[in-house]
């Protein structure tokens, strides 16, 4: 089964969201005969419905293509289709480490975007050869010459011999295959007889086969019947089957050096298979591990609660199943006075949060409420200890805290000139510090340091609406810095609502509090008594709105008669309302929570 090393090419496709990399992958599969016409469907590698609908790739996928080149030789091309979105950058990093080259796909009508940059720099860090592919050249707006110049200016790689294609119509696809064979390097030397050393690229759960592990063999041979050992965790498993994706699962006898394939080994949980771990044979282990990956750290936290408390156990089961497939998603139980039992969940970013929420609602038919997203704060206590704060409601007494540190990010924004002023204003409003501003033709590239707290709220939506969708945004975490942060509580009828408490910067507290109170005033229905809605910092009220009471006309049955009769009825009503306000409970509808947390829509 084994293919000579110089006839193997391992490559990934790197691009910004929507520049057509999944479509290009479809064409490559079609042209090399991976699937026949009947089995072909659009974005064949995006296996989740949500991936296909949103037109984004979430999990990295792999395919083995067999291609007979124009020089008459047979080649094996292993393609890894990577996600383009910033939240899934860790999926990109591990996919790139399994390859020697990359196709950089750039939309010929739009040019280089912020995430193109981030992913290309990752590819360059992995010493990849890069073949530039200009896609969508059939569009009337395509400007291949301008985009080539832009690639050379911004990224600094030679684009003079870029392959011009249209993945949609299939134009130029064969040139891409030839470029892969001729320009990308074969895998570095691997020894079939050396002890087994393989990198764990990805893993996911299959209800029939257990955990399927995607591996890239470096030295030695992986075959059925071996007992393998994960060097990071020390766990041992017998290999049950080895195979490749074409993109259908096809079993093969063994996987040799340089090859990409999958194994199953009756592994029960994805958490047991750490991405970036080294797999070796238990009987004859390799000496040195591969330089490992950092496991992905959750960045954004929020509470997920079932709308109906009876769904709690179903939600627990559903989250367990998603965790099987997505080790970067973490959750633990929490309770809230307003929302009952639920979970505190950690995500890689806002898109990750949205996708998990949508998958829970879709695949498991659950109705959920999410609380306001928050980031991980570091608390330096007066007694010299340090704590991590995931949920603003758990914040200890202010007297015990010496200082609070919050995470900051380095953000790169690319935008047409026309929107530059508005975007800079937005960044300044969000306490941003400008680091750099460069021009590339008619587009500007700005680098800002921003507090993550200000970005998780609604920054991305605002950026897109200010720039009419033209600006693109990419970020990575830089460090923790001390900030003047305060906890803001929301009181409804003088009762604190824990699900709405948040940490905000002192300068923005009043504005944010007022906006939230106004929003709740619209959303909470009137009761028989008046309801005050207040935003408080410590003991100080910074904003207040009042929902007026519903009034029943108690004097309607008095026709004429003495005024004292009317007054008596009105006084009696007033007394009842006072008592009602004292003992009455304000029911906050679920919609009010959901809307109040989408503060960015005003």
From Swiss-Prot:
Reactions accelerated catalytically: GTP + H2O = GDP + phosphate + H(+)
EC main group: hydrolase
Record-listed GTP binding positions: 18-23, 135-138
Membrane topology category: Peripheral membrane protein
Domain tr-type G positions: 6-188
SMART domains: EFG_C
Keyword annotations of the record: Cell inner membrane, Cell membrane, GTP-binding, Hydrolase, Membrane, Nucleotide-binding, Protein biosynthesis
PROSITE patterns linked to this entry: G_TR_1, G_TR_2
EC number(s) recorded for this UniProt protein: 3.6.5.n1
Record field: transmembrane: none
UniProt cross-references to NCBIfam families, sorted A to Z: lepA, small_GTP
Protein name: Elongation factor 4
Primary gene name: lepA
């Amino acid at each position: 089964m084994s293919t000579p090393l110089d006839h193997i090419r391992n490559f990934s496709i790197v691009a910004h969201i929507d520049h057509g990399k999944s479509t290009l992958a479809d064409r490559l599969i079609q042209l090399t005969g991976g699937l026949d016409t009947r089995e072909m469907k659009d974005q064949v590698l995006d296996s989740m419905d949500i991936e296909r609908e949103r037109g984004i790739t979430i999990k990295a996928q792999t395919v083995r293509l067999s291609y007979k080149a124009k020089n008459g030789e047979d080649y094996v091309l292993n393609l890894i289709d990577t996600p383009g979105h910033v939240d899934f950058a860790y999926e990109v990093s591990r996919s790139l480490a399994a390859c020697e080259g990359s196709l950089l796909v750039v939309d010929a009508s739009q040019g280089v975007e912020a995430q193109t940059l981030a992913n290309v720099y990752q590819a360059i860090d992995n010493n990849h050869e890069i073949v530039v592919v200009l896609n969508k050249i059939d569009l009337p707006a395509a400007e291949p010459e301008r985009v080539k110049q832009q690639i050379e200016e911004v990224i600094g790689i030679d684009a003079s011999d870029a392959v011009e294609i249209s993945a949609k119509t299939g134009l130029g696809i064969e040139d891409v295959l030839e470029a892969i064979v001729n320009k990308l390097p074969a895998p570095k030397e691997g020894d079939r007889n050396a002890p087994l050393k393989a990198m764990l690229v990805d893993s996911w759960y299959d209800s029939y086969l257990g955990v399927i592990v995607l591996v890239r063999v470096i030295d030695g041979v992986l075959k059925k019947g071996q007992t393998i050992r994960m060097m990071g965790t020390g766990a041992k498993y017998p290999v049950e089957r080895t195979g490749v994706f074409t993109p259908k699962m096809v079993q093969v006898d063994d996987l040799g050096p340089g090859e990409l394939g999958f194994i199953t080994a009756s592994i029960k949980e994805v958490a047991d298979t750490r991405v970036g771990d080294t797999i070796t044979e238990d009987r004859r282990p390799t000496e040195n591990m591969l330089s490992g990956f950092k496991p992905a750290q959750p960045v954004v936290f929020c509470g997920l609660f079932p709308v109906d408390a009876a769904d709690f156990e179903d939600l627990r089961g559903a989250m367990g199943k998603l965790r099987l497939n997505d080790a970067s998603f973490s959750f633990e139980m929490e309770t809230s006075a307003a929302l009952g039992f639920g979970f505190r969940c950690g995500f890689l970013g806002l898109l990750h949060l949205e996708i998990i929420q949508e998958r829970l609602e879709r695949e498991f038919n659950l109705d959920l409420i999410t609380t306001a997203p928050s980031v991980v704060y570091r608390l330096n206590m007066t007694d010299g200890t340090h704590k991590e704060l995931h949920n603003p409601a758990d914040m200890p007494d202010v007297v015990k805290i010496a200082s609070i540190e919050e995470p900051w990010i380095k953000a790169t924004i690319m935008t047409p000139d026309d929107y530059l002023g508005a975007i800079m204003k937005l960044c300044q409003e969000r306490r941003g510090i400008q680091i750099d501003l460069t021009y590339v033709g008619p587009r500007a590239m700005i680098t800002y340091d921003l507090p993550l707290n200000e970005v998780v709220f609604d920054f991305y939506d605002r950026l897109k609406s200010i720039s009419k969708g033209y600006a693109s945004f990419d970020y990575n975490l830089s460090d923790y810095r001390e900030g003047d942060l305060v906890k803001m509580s929301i009181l409804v009828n003088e009762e604190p609502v824990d699900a709405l408490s948040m940490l905000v910067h002192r300068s923005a507290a009043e504005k944010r509090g007022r906006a939230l109170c106004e929003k709740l005033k619209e959303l909470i229905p009137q009761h028989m008594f008046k309801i005050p809605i207040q935003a408080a910092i410590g003991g100080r009220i910074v904003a207040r709105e009042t929902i007026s009471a519903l009034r029943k006309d108690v004097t309607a049955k008095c026709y004429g008669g003495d005024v004292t009769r009317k007054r008596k009825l009105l006084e009696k009503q007033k007394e009842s309302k006072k008592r009602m306000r004292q003992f009455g409970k304000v029911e906050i509808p679920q919609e009010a929570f959901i809307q109040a947390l989408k503060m960015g829509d005003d």
